[in-house]
Amino acid sequence: MTIRTRGTLPVCAATVVVTLAGASLSIQHSFGAQAVVIDRGSRDYTLPEQMQWRATEDGTTSSLYGDPSKPGLYAYIVKRGPNVWSKPHFHDNDRFVTVLDGTLWVGTGKFDPQRTVPLKAGSFVRDIAGGIHFEGTKDDGVTLYFIGIGPSLNHPAEASTTTTIGSGADVIDPAVRQVQRAEEMPKESFVLYGDSSKPGLYVQYQRRAPNNWSRPHYHSIDRVVMVLGGTMWIGTEPSGDRTRTVAVPKGGFIRDIAQGIHYDGSGNDPMWIQIAGVGPTATTNVDPPK
């Protein structure tokens, strides 16, 4: 259930006009240079403008993979407007939330919007199973990416079961919610949760420098990828041909299908992605045809 409050928001408009005269602008890439068909049986993807949205009690939602009410991995996006809050609740299993845009205000225990901490785009939250928590938005809205293993439903918390701890920076109970702020994250790739070589959910952040490409490879189990920054260029054939790739920008979603051969790279700009799946899984490289 959500609580909606009203606020007065400043309204501003800006118009930017750029005129290019007396010169021609040419941008050339060594990838994506021709019409490309991605093998959707090896790798499926959804561009931001292709996502299907529906209104729910939790906000405007786009389901990307699986179903939280059913067994297995799930992934979905929620958009919430300004001044929208959830009531204290808990989940059956751990849930993992990444802030894609805007600011999320998170709290634990008794509902109190003043006892929350802000998480900006790129920040990550682990909601621990059974832990009572709440969250919401203030003057700006938020876009959130959720992943986890179902079935895991939302259960409202009884008022008598909520407690309040700490003050200031200590308002988040780490036994209920574990927070990783974007500004405190390492600048290189790292594991957020789990281990892909062991049973259970794993979550990884991967950063790539410009023009950093993988070899053609496949995975033993499906995994899902969210582009958090830059552009991910994806292909689906053993050749690893960079000219036969499709650009997936920030906010795009990719499903690597088990046993499907694929490859990818960062192009001319740095790339930042989040990878999630269920272990144990392995990556097997594929030699290009001779």
PLM region spans:
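Double-stranded beta-helix
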Residues: 38-44, 114, 134-173, 243-246, ...
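Conserved short histidine dyad/triad with adjacent acidic residue
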Residues: 74-91, 129, 202-219, 257-258
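Short acidic-glycine-tyrosine-enriched beta hairpin
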Residues: 111-130, 238-259
